């Protein structure tokens, strides 16, 4: 990997680590462990959306780092997701396999500088995006995300996570912004979020309810968030793209720079 690509990959990882640890660092019943080799986030509930391990560097100690993270959640009987930036070496892969984790998704890490972006102004008729300003809207955000998991235990705990967040003041902090897309009748159908870190702003959680997909709502959410960011930020913007969303981000000016593999242990999953 080229030096420039390595640097951008590190920025993407750092912003992600800030995002997934932001609530846990200041919430009762949650915890964050950080070493030079990994970061572990325990949300205090059996939900792999928020119980996260990040392998920070694939080096001589990566095998032990993977083992420490997977053993921790196994002892708690909690599901977890393990996020690994490529290149991922053979020893880490072997330990991941030995721990019983399976590959759940592969995302593309992408970046762009504000000066290179020109968001589209298009907004579908009968649809609007707004930044969340009330505890009730935080709960709506969680309700949309939880619907992506059907009737599973994961869905219940995702909803509970945002109910607890709504009771705190963390969602009002400037580091994090939550957005919700609603229809004219007030029905929430799409969500998105941002996270500010030392070197970048990250875009996350772009998701639309199944029955409202293919109508441009997710794309409109992304471009609205991007427009908001550009009103106050003139530097680096990062995100992670699934295969389905990569095209929208590339057309907007984002460049792929790294692959991120997400593994899950499946403990507690219905």
Regions found by a protein language model. Give the residues of each.
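Conserved beta-hairpin
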Residues: 32-35, 94-103, 175-190
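Conserved active-site tyrosine of GNAT-family acetyltransferases
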Residues: 96, 249, 254
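Conserved acetyl-CoA-binding loop-helix of GNAT-fold acetyltransferases
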Residues: 63-70, 205-210, 214-227, 231, ...
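A conserved beta-turn-beta hairpin within the catalytic core of GNAT-like acetyltransferases
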Residues: 44-51, 104, 196-203, 213
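A short, well-structured alpha-helix characteristic of acyl/acetyltransferase catalytic modules
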Residues: 135-148
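Acyl-donor-binding surface of acyltransferase catalytic domains
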Residues: 60-137, 239, 263-265
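A conserved beta-strand-loop-helix scaffold within acyl/acetyltransferase catalytic domains
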Residues: 153-209
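N-terminal charged segments
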Residues: 1-76, 88, 93, 155
């Amino acid at each position: 990997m080229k030096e420039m690509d390595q640097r951008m990959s590190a920025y993407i990882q750092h912003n992600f680590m800030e995002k997934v640890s932001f609530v846990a660092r200041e919430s009762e019943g949650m915890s964050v462990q950080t070493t030079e080799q990994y970061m572990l986030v325990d949300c205090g509930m059996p939900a792999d959306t928020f119980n996260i391990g990040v392998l920070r560097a694939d080096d001589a100690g990566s095998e032990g780092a993977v083992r420490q993270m997977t053993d921790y959640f196994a002892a708690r009987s909690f599901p977890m997701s393990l996020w690994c930036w490529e290149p991922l070496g053979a020893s880490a892969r072997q330990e991941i396999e030995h721990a019983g984790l399976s590959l759940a998704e592969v995302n593309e890490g992408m970046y762009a500088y504000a000066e290179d972006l020109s968001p589209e102004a298009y907004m579908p008729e009968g649809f609007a995006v707004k930044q969340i300003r009330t505890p009730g809207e935080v709960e709506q955000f969680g309700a949309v995300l939880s619907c992506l998991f059907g009737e599973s235990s994961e869905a219940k705990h995702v909803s509970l996570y945002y109910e607890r967040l709504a009771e705190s003041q963390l969602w009002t902090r400037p580091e994090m912004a939550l957005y919700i897309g609603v229809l004219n009748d007030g029905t929430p159908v799409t969500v998105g979020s941002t996270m500010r870190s030392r070197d970048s702003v990250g875009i996350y959680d772009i998701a639309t309810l199944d029955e409202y997909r293919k109508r441009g709502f997710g794309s409109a959410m992304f471009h609205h968030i991007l427009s908001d960011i550009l009103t106050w930020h003139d530097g680096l913007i990062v995100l992670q793209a699934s295969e389905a969303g990569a095209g929208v981000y590339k057309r907007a000016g984002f460049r792929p720079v790294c692959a991120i593999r997400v593994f899950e242990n499946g403990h507690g999953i219905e």
